[in-house]
Amino acid sequence: MIRIDEIWLSTQPMDMRAGMDTTMAQVVRAFGYIKPHCAYLFCNKRGHRMKVLVHDGLGIWLCVRRLEQGKFHWAQVHQGESMAISPEQLQALIQGLPWQRIGRQQVVTML
């Protein structure tokens, strides 16, 4: 099992032809560094392919996922930003499900 303490999602689309070194460079451009035990997620422009780069403390893993139908529900934040997501949100995201509200506490702000 690969230990993952933090999961970071980038809003910048990535060319899925990129190999290990190009993906690592994209992570450094988007996040500033590659931390051990962190996963960095990127999606292509069409939204049906995802790359995940993980530093396990000893080396780098590069995983690719493609949806046969539909698209990933990617973050709707400003271009160039990134955000942290939870493991539960990641599970929904990789299945192509809406994940943005998973794990949020339902807080009443007005009566």
Where are the regions a protein language model picked out?
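Polybasic/polar functional segments that serve as interface/processing modules
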Residues: 1-111
